[in-house]
Amino acid sequence: MNYFPWLTIIVVFPIFAGSLIFFLPHKGNRVIRWYTICICILELLLTTYAFCYHFQSDDPLIQLVEDYKWIDFFDFHWRLGIDGLSIGPILLTGFITTLATLAAWPVTRDSRLFHFLMLAMYSGQIGLFSSRDLLLFFIMWELELIPVYLLLAMWGGKKRLYSATKFILYTAGGSVFLLMGVLGVALYGSNEPTLNFETSVNQSYPVVLEIIFYIGFFIAFAVKSPIIPLHTWLPDTHGEAHYSTCMLLAGILLKMGAYGLIRINMELLPHAHSIFSPWLMIIGTIQIIYAASTSLGQRNLKKRIAYSSVSHMGFIIIGISSLTDTGLNGALLQIISHGFIGAALFFLAGTTYDRIRLVYLDEMGGIAIPMPKMFTMFSSFSMASLALPGMSGFVAELIVFFGIITGQKYLLMPKLLITFVMAIGIILTPIYSLSMPRQMFYGYKLFNAPKDSFFDSGPRELFLSISIFLPVIGIGIYPDFVLSLAVDKVEVILSNFFYR
């Protein structure tokens, strides 16, 4: 048993160190940037060290457990712990946040507040992935909203207030259902409120009550994931946010919804999940086709990438609802894979906008010759997005396919039908993925854009793009690096469906 509070330090350090930013000089942008990037690197190294030396990947139980009494009156505890399910998203959070702070170097207006909000998000995300208490999970879930709202409303585009308001209305509305679900689970069947995850996992509920809890949690996670028809905040938010904020949104924020579906809906409410899983499968299949088709009709580059994110989330939903260890492992791999690819595409879209000041694809064209490095990286990540063999997206989608085909819960004809419709979605993906670089980089040169702004990627942008590209290739060639972390935990989760 390791008694050193590793997880508490990892959760609290970014927001505590971030609050010291306000003591730095107001106009010292360079100092603020380096301070923030050093905090992020130190946090990532600390997390990696703690996991390498104190985490056993073959143990499906909760590790690095910490339990401190926080508020005596409510019997509220600060409970943290990690398992194979949460270690991947935590490392992804550290990696993407570090690169997002590097991407945010051009931000000079109110840079102290900007970097503090990014570090506050960092703490909230790691706190969410490592919390073992339902109320703490809810608090960390809410801690995300205010930084994202401010990052949108203060550093967004022309319609930033509209998109920020839409974001807060959708996510706060979902949070109401999450709070109701948390309180319902906590207050059921005992005089003392039970907020501990371990106690709740072993609790059994009447079927009707479990279904009500399931629907409440599902709505909250469906908004964040997002699952259609609760997805309309996402394209507006991505269309207006600064690209460093988009990296955090696409790379981590959307994954919180998928993580919640697995951690709470699957693990705590297995009976209701087995009832709803066929409907989830249908929703996921429709989502792949709908979002891919809608993405094709988008003129705005960032909105097109946003709809591609919605389409890729469809594979995660199908993997979660397949009720097989293969399908769930595929969903977890897709969570990590799309975290890298989505963040990279938004970063490249944002840096391209910085140069040519155009957002609509039909106004772009002919910039491959003056910007060959940008062209190479954007084309590579577009290929990764369409699941090219050898890249992480291909392995993830293939494993989800195998998960459906090998599933025992569904009859042969529904499985074949869903596989066929998913295959249509995979055919649509290259159409919108490849039309982006075609419209941006090929064709006639722009005569209305100033020539002096056509400079190629600098060392910072190249370093950032390659840093994301290496894991995409690495996971594509050797996916067991990610799968080995969660495979034992996945078996434990799925055993609930067959032995409970």
Curated annotation (Swiss-Prot):
It is an enzyme of class 7 (translocase). InterPro entries: NADH_Q_OxRdtase_chain4, NADH_Q_OxRdtase_chainM/4, NADH_UbQ_OxRdtase, ND/Mrp_TM. Its EC number is 7.1.1.-. The chain crosses the membrane at residues 4-24, 35-55, 87-107, 113-130, 134-154, 167-187, 208-228, 242-262, 272-292, 305-325, 330-350, 386-406, 416-436, 462-482. It is found in: Plastid, Chloroplast thylakoid membrane. Keywords: Chloroplast, Membrane, NAD, NADP, Plastid, Plastoquinone, Quinone, Thylakoid, Translocase, Transmembrane, Transmembrane helix. Its main location: plastid. Coiled coil: none annotated. One of its GO terms (molecular function) is ubiquinone binding. It is a multi-pass membrane protein. GO terms for cellular component: chloroplast thylakoid membrane. It holds the Pfam family Proton_antipo_M. It comes from the Eukaryota. One of its GO terms (biological process) is ATP synthesis coupled electron transport. It catalyses: a plastoquinone + NADH + (n+1) H(+)(in) = a plastoquinol + NAD(+) + n H(+)(out); a plastoquinone + NADPH + (n+1) H(+)(in) = a plastoquinol + NADP(+) + n H(+)(out). Belongs to the complex I subunit 4 family. This is NAD(P)H-quinone oxidoreductase chain 4, chloroplastic.
